[in-house]
Regions:
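Conserved alpha/beta enzyme-core scaffold
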Residues: 1-153
Length: 153
């Protein structure tokens, strides 16, 4: 039988180590709403000085995104935010010319990931989850509108 707990502990790392996978020109997907990867966002923002033109997709963001605060701090667009749904936080970012809007209906989002012409690529998916269960599974939480499709991409 596979010892999932051992595998989990061997792969467990810090947010600072995890974001080292991000390179210039990559497309990142931030999970949305309650699954926004806050610790990874903060760690990635600390790497802003060493990165250029990292594209990020996300939506239903209810608090300031640290990577975009890093853009302001550096006075350059290291991280290019692409919002799938404009709500309060996204509108504020768009007014400051810090966000692009990708219009669609909410129900279309999973299909966008299935069609390569609509979503170019998903190089990295950042998502906040709860801890692993005894069977090696992670609960992705209540915010899964297109998470499965993003993972499969």
């Amino acid at each position: 039988m596979i010892d999932y707990r051992k595998q989990y502990e061997e792969k467990l790392t810090t947010p600072e180590e995890a974001v080292k996978i991000v390179k210039d020109g990559m497309w990142l997907d931030y999970a949305h709403a309650l699954s926004v990867p806050n610790l990874l966002d903060k760690a990635l923002a600390k790497r802003a000085e060493e990165l250029n033109e990292v594209f990020v997709r996300g939506y239903l963001i209810y608090h300031p995104i640290q990577i975009l605060e890093a853009n302001k701090r550096l006075n350059r667009d290291v991280f290019v935010w692409n919002s799938w749904f404009m709500q309060g936080q996204d509108r504020r970012m768009a007014k400051e010319a810090r966000a692009f809007f990708v219009p669609m209906r909410y129900a279309e989002q999973p299909e966008m990931y299935r069609r390569p012409d609509d979503v170019e690529t998903v190089d990295v998916l950042f998502i906040q989850t709860c801890g692993m269960d005894q069977n090696g599974n992670f609960n992705l939480g209540p915010c899964i509108a297109s998470t499965r499709e993003a993972i499969q991409r």
